[in-house]
């Protein structure tokens, strides 16, 4: 029923890569108007045609757009958008995947957040749902995030979206092969150099 819409989401947000199983469930739930996952995870998935946050310059004035420093930042952000595949609004700003070609292909995609200041944050876990649940665990009424995560995992399982683990300490926390924050800095410096700003 949603095959065409899922294919479009894959093309627009993931460069045609297969949509992970949990993301598929969450997308269909949003499109069906279900709010149970939204309530638990605080995610709102992008609709077709929404601009990637790293490519959005609509908030900048003409003067800012003409500024060589800002042009360097925008060019670096556009390059980063090739690797930062954001799929939803939530968390500190936006949430998605880090798909740099130098990352090992034999593991699940790294999860990341981008905040409104263009800072990159890693999420633990092997799936988007695990990463977001771990992040949300620290904002629950339960002060112990390990217990809160287990409770969230149980609620998600009841809704038909079981996590790979209910143990917070067992969540995957593998380091990036390529650090997004460092790469962004390097790209900005390279763009500054192209513009004679060094």
Regions found by a protein language model. Give the residues of each.
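Compact, glycine/acidic-enriched structural inserts
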Residues: 105-148
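An amphipathic alpha-helical core segment
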Residues: 137-171
